[in-house]
């Protein structure tokens, strides 16, 4: 008996379980690739960004952010695009960009959580329908059923439960893994956002101090 034969013995409930597994796998692959692209060396990134801002090379900083292609770099880039309008506009742009990037990072996680919850429930539903089938067989045979007569219902009950758990457990584990990775990225985004805002604010204060000194000398 091969895997396909076992699948068929699980009955009609196996098809929605199979569908949920395909959806869960697709979401997991998509999120894995997204997280792989989103990784960035935050300390090294901030060293470069601070250097650009100190030198007033905002276009260079923006170009560097475009090269990095990560959520962290994206929020900094969108903030620096508003650099000429002042500190407050930069802060607002970074906050708005942060909300957008968080939504992108969390995309699909609710679907994966649903798969983790629904797959085992479908398995238990298959258990119920399988047991109903077994008891109907007993009733039809007036209580004279032998084990082979009940095998079909028992097969369905056990196989659907097993496959539901086989799909649900990894889906739950992957959901928690991706959720933790997203939280880590969000933390990095918040840290970088605050650092960039502070650097711009400090740089603005330095310029103001220089202007004051020039006026006093005059």
For each predicted feature, which ranges?
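Predominantly long cytosolic amphipathic alpha-helical stalk/bundle segments
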Residues: 39-125, 129-141, 174-218
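Glycine-rich helix-loop "coupling/hinge" segments at transmembrane-helix boundaries
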Residues: 137-156
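Residue-level signature of catalytic and energy-coupling elements of molecular machines
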Residues: 11, 25, 61, 76, ...
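Alpha-helical transmembrane segments of multi-pass membrane proteins
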Residues: 29-34, 169-181
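Alpha-helical transmembrane segments of integral membrane proteins
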Residues: 14-27, 113-123, 167-171
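Hydrophobic alpha-helical transmembrane segments of polytopic membrane proteins
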Residues: 155-173
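Hydrophobic membrane-targeting segments
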Residues: 1-44
């Amino acid at each position: 008996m091969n895997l396909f034969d076992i699948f068929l013995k699980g009955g009609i409930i196996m098809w929605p379980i199979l569908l949920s597994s395909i959806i869960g796998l697709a979401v997991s692959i998509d999120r894995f690739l997204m997280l792989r692209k989103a990784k960035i060396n935050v300390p090294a990134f901030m060293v470069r960004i601070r250097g650009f801002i100190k030198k007033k090379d905002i276009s260079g900083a923006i170009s560097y952010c475009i090269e990095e292609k990560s959520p962290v770099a994206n929020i900094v880039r969108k903030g620096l695009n508003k650099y000429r309008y002042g500190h407050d506009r930069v802060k607002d742009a970074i906050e708005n960009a942060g909300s957008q990037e968080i939504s992108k990072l969390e995309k699909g996680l609710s679907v994966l959580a649903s798969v983790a919850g629904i797959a085992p429930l479908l398995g238990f539903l298959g258990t119920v329908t399988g047991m109903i089938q077994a008891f109907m067989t007993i009733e039809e045979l007036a209580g004279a059923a032998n084990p082979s007569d009940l095998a079909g219902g028992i097969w369905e009950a056990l196989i659907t439960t097993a496959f539901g758990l086989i799909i649900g457990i990894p889906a739950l584990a992957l959901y928690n893994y991706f959720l933790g990775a997203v939280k880590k990225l969000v933390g990095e985004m918040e840290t970088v956002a605050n650092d960039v805002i502070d650097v711009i604010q400090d740089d603005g204060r330095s310029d103001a101090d220089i202007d004051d000194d020039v006026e006093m000398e005059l």
